[in-house]
Each structure stands twice: as C-alpha cells, then as structure tokens.
C-alpha cells in the first residue's frame, strides 16, 4: 500500500518554494527524497496555477491529481470538466502512472453521484479516463458499476467521519463489493483523506492519502511511528496538561523522545519553535509509515462484517 502525502507543493514545501528555503539541510533532504519517490497528491483546485506546474515540472514530479472539487465547492468556486481535462492533457508529464493508469481522479459532483457519473462520461468523451470516485452514503449501484468496469477506483466523502462509523461503512463496502470470496481485492482502491492508521491497516487498500502531516504540524505536534502524535510546540495549550505534551512527560519518556529525534537528525528545540521543521519531520514519518505498511501489507480482507441498519 502506498501512503500519499497530500498538498506538499500547494503548501510550498518543495525545492524553490518559499517554505523550502526555511528548512535545514536535513529537512530539505527529506522533502527531496519525497519528490524522488513520488508519493504526493495534489488538488487541481490548488495547483492549477502555472507557478505550481512550473515548480513540479522543474523537480520532475509525478503526482496523483485530485480535482479538489470539495474545496472549490466550500469556497463557492465552480470547476469546469473541460478545463480539468485540458490541464491533465497539458501536464501529463507530471502525473503519476500506475501500470498504465494515469493517476488523476474524476471531477466530483459534490453531493450528487449522478453528476459525478456524468462528469466521468464527459471526461472520457474528451479523451481522458479518470479514476472514478464513489462517496460514502451514495447509492451502492454506482460502486457496483465502477467495480465491474474499472481497474482502479477511489473512495471519498470519508473526512470527518469517526473511525468507528467509518469502519462500519467500509466493512460493508469491502465485503459486499471490493473483495472476492477469498478476501482478495477485485480491483485497486484508493482511499481519499484516510488519517487513521487502523483504517489504513484494516483493509487491502492499494493506496491512501492524508494531509495529517501539515495539520498536525499546524497544531503544534509531530507524528511518531512509536507513540503516535505528540505535542511539542512551545505555544501549545497542552503544555499545562499533565501527560499531554512532551514537556510534561516523565523524564524517562522525555529522554526516549529526545533520543529518537536526535537519531533521525532533528532537535526538540527546533521542533518546538519552528512550524516548518515539524512539517518536515511529519513527512519523514510518512516515509517510515510507508515502509511499515509495505511490510505488513494485507492482501486479504478477513474481518467480520458489520451491517448498517
């Protein structure tokens, strides 16, 4: 399974961009390695501007492209299917390719599965076959159709749903439509906005993406492979809550964290004061997470199904 870091270019963390210049050599090394391996997802709504295209092309980027329809919808921006396809065709050289499938998803019709399907057809008529998207809560006949007719699909509409509720819905979708009788996935499936590691591990995803790296950094935290998210910012309100911040853990726990940070080229002092350093550290954690997921990769889905009533 591949874990994509979402919105790295649109947050200006790659070479030549304004946050990149604030990074140390070690932090730049991490971002450079991310670009070299390619697990980055960007939204057309944000990287449609030529400045982002130029930055990605200069670095020989190969990204997974999402339309960004939900973000545009919340801002009252109307996106054009024709313009989206034009962007994809003009910039095919910066898009990731998985076994002949160009990694660009359909322009969603927010809250309207029929419009999403119409957009799918229109994009195909314009000469590009995008990855279709099925959203949580939609008529499952759309999912049945996508599974029958496409080799790689996406699941969306899951952001903001609790892990418990998401597990109930995903158990149903995977068991009914996405795996065969032996528990093997019928097709490749990408999960948009998957932030919970238990959700990543529970199903045989081919890929997922998450923007937790930047969100966690913004809220003053770092993501660690061993202990999960830890608050480190000197401005974090959790500094005053026992056991909720690195500064108020036990001396033994603190030393374990400091030793780990030092071993991978980071300092607690810089992480506690520099937002960009936390973001770079979290990108490093994504790399570790990718390695862990590859080692634990589940090719079969063997969990008890919970029906929705």
Where do the protein language model's features map onto the residues?
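A structural motif corresponding to the C-terminal end of an alpha-helix
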Residues: 34, 90-103, 122-128, 176-187, ...
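Acidic, divalent-metal-coordinating active-site segment for phosphoryl/phosphodiester hydrolysis
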Residues: 195-200, 204
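C-terminal extensions of enzymes
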Residues: 1-35, 248-309
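Generic structural signal for well-ordered alpha-helices
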Residues: 52-53, 85-92, 117-121, 143, ...
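Glycine/Thr-rich beta-alpha phosphate-binding loop at enzyme active sites
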Residues: 129-192, 196, 212-236
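Conserved, mostly hydrophobic/aromatic
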Residues: 66, 132, 203
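Non-catalytic, usually N-terminal nucleic-acid engagement modules in DNA/RNA processing proteins
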Residues: 1-118, 303-309
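Metal-ion/cofactor- or nucleotide/acyl-coenzyme-handling active-site neighborhoods
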Residues: 61, 204-271, 308
């Amino acid at each position: 399974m591949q874990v994509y870091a979402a919105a790295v270019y649109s947050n200006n963390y790659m070479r030549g961009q304004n946050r990149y210049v604030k990074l140390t050599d070690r932090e730049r090394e991490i971002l450079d390695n991310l670009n070299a391996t390619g697990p980055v997802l960007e939204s057309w709504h944000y990287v449609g501007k030529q400045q982002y295209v130029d930055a990605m092309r200069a670095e020989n980027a190969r990204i997974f492209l999402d339309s960004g329809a939900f973000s545009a919808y919340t801002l009252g921006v109307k996106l054009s299917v024709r313009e989206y396809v034009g962007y994809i065709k003009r910039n095919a050289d910066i898009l990731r390719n998985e076994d002949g499938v160009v990694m660009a998803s359909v322009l969603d019709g927010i809250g309207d599965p029929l419009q999403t399907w119409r957009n799918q057809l229109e994009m195909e008529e314009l000469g590009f076959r995008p990855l279709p998207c099925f959203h949580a809560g939609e008529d499952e006949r759309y999912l049945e159709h996508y599974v029958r007719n496409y080799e790689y699909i996406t699941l969306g509409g899951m952001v903001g749903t609790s892990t418990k509720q998401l597990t109930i819905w995903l158990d149903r979708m995977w068991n009914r439509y996405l795996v065969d009788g032996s528990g093997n996935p019928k097709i490749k499936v990408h999960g948009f906005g998957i932030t919970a590691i238990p959700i990543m591990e529970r199903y045989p995803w081919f890929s997922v993406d998450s923007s937790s790296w930047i969100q966690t950094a913004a809220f003053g935290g770092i993501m660690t492979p061993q202990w999960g998210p830890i608050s480190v910012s000197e401005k974090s309100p959790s500094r005053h809550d026992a056991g909720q911040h690195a500064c108020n853990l036990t001396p033994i726990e603190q030393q374990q964290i400091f030793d780990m940070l030092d071993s991978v080229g980071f300092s607690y002092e810089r992480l506690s004061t520099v937002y960009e350093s936390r973001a770079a550290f979290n990108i490093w954690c994504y790399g570790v997470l990718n390695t862990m997921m590859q080692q634990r990769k589940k090719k079969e889905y063997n969990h008890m199904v919970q029906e929705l009533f």
